[in-house]
Amino acid sequence: MEKPAAACYHLPGLFEFYELYRRFLPLYREHREYFYDWCAIGSIYGAPAGCIWGGGRISCGGATVREVLALLREYGISGRLTFSNSLLRAEHLADPQCNALCEQFAKGGSVPNGVIVHSDLLADYLRQRWPELYLVSSTTKVLTDFAQLRQELAKPQFRYVVPDFRLNPALEQLRTLPSEQKAKVEFLCNECCWFGCTERKRCYETVSRQNLGEDCPDHRCAAPDAAGGYRFSKAMRSPGFIGVEDIRQRYLPAGFSHFKIEGRGLGSALVLEFLLYYMTRPEYQLQVRETIYLDNMLDLF
């Protein structure tokens, strides 16, 4: 993991956007002047396709485990497996693919790797089998109540806890947390879900069922503007959005330093826009685009 900075970002798509990070990370290391000096990459999270322990999103990552671990080792970055299925049963713990992934992540890093979990059953299993893997309490638990968050933060098995994005604006309450609990809070910054959604947990449960191979229909979102899908501009208008200036002027001074960027189910072009917005100085954003994909012969239409 990088030398601790004021703000640590936890980035999406370890397997899903391997090719993007293969191009971005050399630039990030060789041209640190392009990027804000008050932030660093804390981890990259994701899962390959076909993982029954997976949750949150249906993974479609095509990179091999060897490629991913080699990239993480080269840049000293922590990798997190997103295993946040909420409906796991005891028989699922024997899954060969997921066990092999945990074994490789436990043994294959230059810095500690971790697992994002929802299921207590899985969390207990991982602690017994691979104590070297740290655990992150998933936002799929939909912790919208401050008392619930405090209870989760008090659990010693979790190094980090990601509350529901609707707790993001509750800074007056969040400031009352002791410093050791503030250090565990990881805010989901750029969620585009409707702030008034009452079916968020049900939506995640549908993904869990599909990852287990159950034949069930997709969750039908009832948000007023659901048909438009994810738009970063829409996420920015949410009361739960945490932008760059929010991080610098509100959250860092309050003692919080971990910020999660969502995007595993999106396209790599949009994830690059997240990297530009959250990490890149405005005067260098064009240079980053040119290095990653933009050239003088690129046609959009």
What does each of the following model-derived ranges do?
Residues 1-148, 152, 158-301:
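Active-site pocket-lining/capping segments in soluble small-molecule metabolic enzymes
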